[in-house]
Curated annotation (Swiss-Prot):
Residues 56-216 are cytoplasmic. This is Transmembrane protein 139. Residues 104-163 are annotated as: Disordered. The gene is TMEM139. May be involved in cellular trafficking of proteins such as SLC4A1. The lineage of its organism: Eukaryota, Metazoa, Chordata, Craniata, Vertebrata. Keywords: Membrane, Phosphoprotein, Signal, Transmembrane, Transmembrane helix. It comes from Homo sapiens (Human).
Length: 216
């Protein structure tokens, strides 16, 4: 089969030869009557070129329609690959890993949230002998129990993380800081001092007024 680019190159030469043959035949018919066979020959040759031109045009139109139909029926491997990627369903493991990464966006270097931290109560090695120590221990146990319940309510599906500090606890030597639970003692209120106010001479504005003072 003749390729399409070759058919496109044959169109213009065939059309040019057809027009030239028709013009030459008509010119010979008008000039002299004794050369009529030659004029008919050029007219016939122009008709042949015209037929060849129309045949080339028809073949070109047929090839274009055939290529368009082939492209519509089979878009090609690239189009099929794009369609497969668009309608591809991920594997169950990939979907689960993606959901877990979306639910936990924090990095590994960052500490866990406060709701997942549970501080266990300290082991009871020895019972305090004085009432202030027992009261402080009860307050600490109550605070740790409330924090543990808040952590369990905030994240039921996550395992608790123990972030208890290791090592001995630092105890303050100041007496005010040792007994935090004790009620502070209040200082007695001192009454204001008494002032002697004299209303004997209300119209006198002198600040040097005295009872035994006499004008000179």
């Amino acid at each position: 089969m003749v390729p399409m680019h070759l058919l496109g190159r044959l169109e213009k030469p065939l059309l040019l030869l057809c027009c030239a043959s028709f013009l030459l035949g008509l010119a010979l018919l008008g000039i002299k009557t004794d050369i009529t066979p030659v004029a008919y020959f050029f007219l016939t040759l122009g008709g042949f070129f015209l037929f060849a031109y129309l045949l080339v045009r028809f073949l070109e139109w047929g090839l274009r329609s055939q290529l368009q139909s082939m492209q519509t029926e089979s878009p090609g491997p690239s189009g099929n690959a794009r369609d497969n990627e668009a309608f591809e369903v991920p594997v169950y493991e990939e979907a689960v890993v993606g959901l877990e990464s979306q639910c936990r966006p924090q990095e590994l270097d960052q500490p866990p949230p406060y709701s997942t931290v549970v501080i266990p109560p300290a082991p009871e090695e020895e019972q305090p002998s004085h009432p202030e120590g027992s009261r402080r221990a009860k307050l600490e146990q109550r605070r740790m129990a409330s924090e543990g319940s808040m952590a369990q309510e905030g994240s039921p599906g996550r395992a608790p993380i123990n972030l208890r500090l290791r090592g001995p606890r630092a105890v303050s030597t100041a007496p005010d800081l040792q007994s935090l639970a004790a009620v502070p003692t209040l200082e007695p209120l001192t009454p204001p001092p008494a002032y002697d106010v004299c209303f004997g001479h209300p119209d006198d504005d002198s600040v040097f007024y005295e009872d035994n003072w006499a004008p000179p």
